[in-house]
Design a protein with these regions (language model features):
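Short alpha-helix in the alpha/beta-hydrolase fold that links the catalytic acid
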Residues: 36, 186, 200-209, 220
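Short glycine-rich catalytic loops that host catalytic nucleophiles or stabilize transition states
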Residues: 54, 218-224
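Short beta-strand/loop motif that positions the catalytic acidic residue
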Residues: 184, 190-192, 196
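Catalytic active-site module of serine/aspartate enzymes centered on a nucleophile-bearing elbow/loop
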Residues: 223-260
Length: 260
């Protein structure tokens, strides 16, 4: 059995009848979204589930045995479990976790009441990543992409190396999800740092313009980089995401899925 890094464990916090699935990003771990999940639970009383995606929070060697199908499957399993026991179900996620958030909302609209993707790639990757993927032959690994954080002294628990084969899997997931964005009809709060060195900020505008929900909001962060859930705007994110989900609950007390 592969050892899980300390701090990268999945977590679950039982609260009220509002369930929130919180998804971490590529090469990262639940450490990056633990404060978000805990904050949503403590401040709003939500029940929170945060799975550890396959190949994450262990080692790059372990990650190389996984791909986007595994990450999507784990996220979907957690969503279905949450939807089976909660009246309202919301999804939020950081980076690739945000992409998975969009993917789930597009494919499983009957299970998701609203979403809040944070720094989600859903179109363009950085030029640096595109150049690596275009190399022939491509390197086996490149330096890690974690800890793009503006706040001093804050470090993300993420791999120091990024398997290029898995980066290619992310690229496929992003492309597939981009083609599904028009199927998203639930309320959405899209969150993006204006200065992000991992995911081009233009992705947020592309997401907002592509999805077909009647309630789409865009929150720009002015004091954070990519890992915004650990950065200077982390409390703002908790308040805005929690407030947004609470607003959706108030508008449809029986749950959007029940109304459908």
């Amino acid at each position: 059995m592969v050892a899980i890094l300390k701090g990268a464990e999945p977590f679950s916090l039982e609260g009220n009848d509002v369930g929130v699935l919180v998804l971490h990003g590529f090469t990262g771990s639940t450490q990056s979204i633990r404060e978000l999940g805990t904050g949503l639970h403590q401040r709003f009383g939500f029940s929170v589930t945060a799975p550890r995606l396959p190949g994450h929070g262990t080692s790059p060697d372990d990650m190389e045995t996984t791909g986007y199908h595994d990450w999507v499957r784990e996220a979907e399993t957690a969503l279905r479990e949450l939807a089976g026991r909660k009246r309202h179900v919301f999804v939020t996620g950081l980076s690739m976790g945000g992409t998975l958030t969009l993917n789930l909302a597009a494919r499983l609209p009957d299970l998701v009441d609203a979403i809040a993707p944070v720094a989600a790639p859903a179109g363009l990757l950085t030029e640096a990543f595109a150049e690596v993927l275009a190399m022939d032959p491509a390197p086996k690994r490149i330096p890690g992409i974690g800890s793009d954080i503006k706040a001093p002294g804050v470090k993300e628990l993420a791999y120091e190396e990024t398997p290029v084969a898995c980066l290619r899997e992310v690229s496929v997931l992003v492309s597939l999800t981009r083609d599904l964005l028009h199927r998203i009809v639930c309320p959405a709060l899209v969150i993006q740092a204006r200065e992000d060195h991992v995911v081009p900020a233009v992705n947020a505008s592309q997401i907002v313009n592509a999805i077909r929900s009647d309630d789409v909001r865009l929150l720009w962060l002015n004091n954070s980089y990519h890992v915004a859930t650990l950065d200077n705007d982390k409390d703002l994110i908790i308040d805005r995401v929690g407030g947004f989900f609470s607003e959706v609950v108030k508008a449809a007390p029986a749950g959007r899925r029940a109304a459908a």
